[in-house]
Amino acid sequence: MSQSDPLNVVSRILNKISKDNFQVLIDQLVSKCQLLDKNESTLFINNIFEKVVEEPSSSSYYIQIINKIQPIFQQNFSIGVGNKLVENFNKRYQILTDQINSNEETFDFNSSKQSFLNLCKFMGECYYTLPSSFLVDVVNNHLPQVTKETADDMTLQQLMEIEIIATSFTSAGKTIESMGGFSSKHENNKTHNNNNNNNNHDHDDDDHDEEDNENNYENTTSTTNNINNNNIQSRENDLHFKGIQKALEDATSVLSFLIENRQLLPPRVRFMVKNLFELKNNKWIIPKAINDDLNAQREVVKVATNHGKTISKSLSEKCDDDSTLNTIFWKSFFQALGIQNYKILRQLMLDDKSNISPSSTSPTIPLSPFLRRSMNITSPSQFNLNNCNNNNNSININNNNMDIDASFDLNDGLMESSSNNNNSNSQLQFSLSSSSGIKDNHNVPTIDLNTISSNNNQQINLPSGFLSPKVARSNSPSLSSVVKQPQSQQNNNNNNNNNNNNTTITTTTSSNNNINNNNNNNNNNKIKESPELSSAPDSNLSVIVSIIDSKIWTPQKEIWKKKIMNKIIPMKSILKKPQKIEILAAIWQNMCDNNYEYGSYLDLCLNLIKMDEGDISPLYSLDGGNVPPVKPYQQSAQPPPPPPSSSSSSAQQPPNEPVNPLLNKLKGPNRRSSMATLQMKPSGISEARRSSISVPFELNRRGSLSGDIPSYCPPAPKLKSTPTLKSTPAIVQNGGSITSTSSSSSSSSSSSSSTTKNIHPTSESKKQPIAKKHKPDLDSFKDVLISSLQDDFALKMFVKKRSLTTYMELLKDLYREFIIEIPLLLKCISLVHNGLYELTDEECTMLFDLEEMAQEQQNLEKQNDQQQNLLTQNNQIFQWKTNTWEEKPQTPPPPPTSYFDLGSDVFVL
């Protein structure tokens, strides 16, 4: 059989059929089937039947193929596809009965029976292509002749035959029910054709033209032929369905007798027969409950098919490091396949807000801090204001417990509450983030209740000068010199009959506050506390987030940053990746809300990155900044030798001087604070950041961007054998003095001996243990920032805050500060493009400029790499002594390997 043989081609197409390519391959299959001859057509039908036996789950595809090729084979070769299928069906049954009677040890009865029952289901589903006597023959051939005497001795084969009848009639039941509709349809066709015939005869009486008479005669003959054919077909169908109904009634009498005696049939077979009777009595319509379940599952599959690729893609991108989130999602998906949970599933998949407020019955999925901060209520922690008096849908808040600055007066925007419960007109005039519908018309700062802890009796020392409702105002000193005295130390608020409280806000109160809340029945809207905040050591992370969320006062910016850094530095080794993401999300959220303080929040991000690299500024120290700043040259340069006239006491170092380990490293010259660039005038090109593309020598860390030979060459590397001042051992004599040369005087030798008394010998330093290799922190702030930019969680927060311009400015500044590189910058730009967000003209302009700058820088880096590769290919080396590029010298010829070398003309004796 050649490869171009039509049967071979059709068989290969049949083997390739799957769910994805079925619609494409079935057209090719039908077109190739027209090229088959009679024998090949028979072989092809046999191949389809064998495919059904091997792959019963794909029987629906083969049924459609049979319906397509049946008229082709019938017209070309007068081959009935149904007859061939029935022949193969009977052969398969004969093989099965022979195996049962042979009693072979290797024969598996259960698997063979299940395979044949799947074949019966297939034959019932493609009933239209089968001969009309198929079901009648099934009843006559497989109905066991059971009587009262022989009923107790039913064999496995007889039980299998009962299952064959039940399976065949169950799958072909809708066709049997179509008998009534079929007959009515033919009656309608009869009346319709009779009306047409009468109209044609009327038309003959009115019209006397010969041509019309001829046409009408032809029409009448054709219609009468159609009527006769339809009548013959309807009679055959009536006889056919009557025969099926009679055979089914005969089978019903036997099967009902077997059902009445419970001991005769196994439970599974008995319920199968009962299901057949229920379908017959219900006109072969599936019961409503089962039908609804099937329809619901079909709709679930349809929705999952439409959204499956998007879900799988998003899960693979966002659940790489979190396997529990992926498990929870698919577990909730498969649990929701029932009817009751289907609406929850559909809402979870189709509603845009499904990831914000998951239902209480479904498992709680941890949200990203960026998504949590982009919600309507942006607090990552639970809050509850117990001193709210809500009677008759009114809100009253007492502010007696808060100590407020004179410059920060809240009394303009806050109404004092009265203890009278009948006062139903009191109002709340300050805004509670975006969740409150009450607007504040006064131009005063508002309290941000976004990050309030859920611990009621927790007392935390807040940094001085920052208003945060996490604790009472009296616990923290104020910025201004004029401070209001606390009004009352005890608040006795009796809140009774509060039945309509829909929003509950909790603040930490002091131990003197006595609050009684009775009959609070409808407290609905509560937000769970962030797991990152609750698991923080000593709850200092909550304080840090509160300081970040607090308002920045212009004269106190440095104090604001200093307080945050002094809280984070002691927790540097304890902070984990989720807690760092929480801090970063708080910074970026406030960067969106307070665009005028963008530079302060950006500088805070850079300071956190420098802290992990040990490049922290001296202003942020562990003791609150009391350590004086250390100049750079004092760290790197060696101390100069003392003059001869200096005393020995001047050379001594003060004992027990506190040393900050974070101040050992200097501030890198290649990274400059963005605040200095924003607040100061732009300096020269050599002192600028990575802000211009045309500067050839600004990026000495990344290499030159110009095409010329670099004018600046790095210093020569130190060799291991090069002696240095530190590694040269001092020659110590018996008196503890260094041996002086013959030209040195006695005064200089005495002074040098006095100075060396306090110097530790190098032998002691050699005995110290070697420091372990520093393992890089995989969860540093820089890595957390990069990973946060790689997905679209942070981008969605900027989009919901309508601060895409801030997002693009942040990307540009992070690139200038050597924190992100060109590939990540291009990926962030592609996330904006793929999100299909509605951008303003300004945002579109900034996005195009950013993309153009990234592409240009990428091209320059490629050119630089090509030039470096070209230099290495030209065999040029740099001479450190002359500071010039020279050609690499040729390697000397090898020594002669024999007694006579023609290349060297030298005889070796």
Curated annotation (Swiss-Prot):
One of its GO terms (molecular function) is RNA binding. The keyword Cytoplasm does not apply. Disruption phenotype: Null cells are arrested at the tight mound stage but accumulate the bright yellow pigment characteristic of mature sori. Although these mutant strains do not form fruiting bodies, many of the cells encapsulate within the mounds. Sporulation occurs about 6 hours earlier, accompanied by precocious expression of a prespore gene, spiA. However, the spores are defective and lose viability over a period of several hours. Unencapsulated cells also die unless they are dissociated from the mounds and shaken in suspension. GO terms for biological process: anatomical structure morphogenesis; cellular response to differentiation-inducing factor 1; chemotaxis; negative regulation of sorocarp stalk cell differentiation; sorocarp development; sporulation resulting in formation of a cellular spore. Residues 216-231, 417-436, 491-525, 739-756 have a biased composition (Low complexity). The keyword Coiled coil applies. Residues 473-490, 721-738 have a biased composition (Polar residues). Plays as essential role in regulating terminal differentiation. Residues 845-877 form a coiled coil. Residues 178-232, 415-439, 460-537, 627-689, 704-774 are annotated as: Disordered. Keywords: Coiled coil. Gene3D superfamilies: 1.25.40.180. Residues 204-215 have a biased composition (Acidic residues). This is Yellow mounds protein A. Residues 7-283 form the MIF4G domain. It comes from Dictyostelium discoideum. It comes from the Eukaryota. InterPro entries: ARM-type_fold, MIF4G-like_typ-3. SMART domains: MIF4G (SM00543).
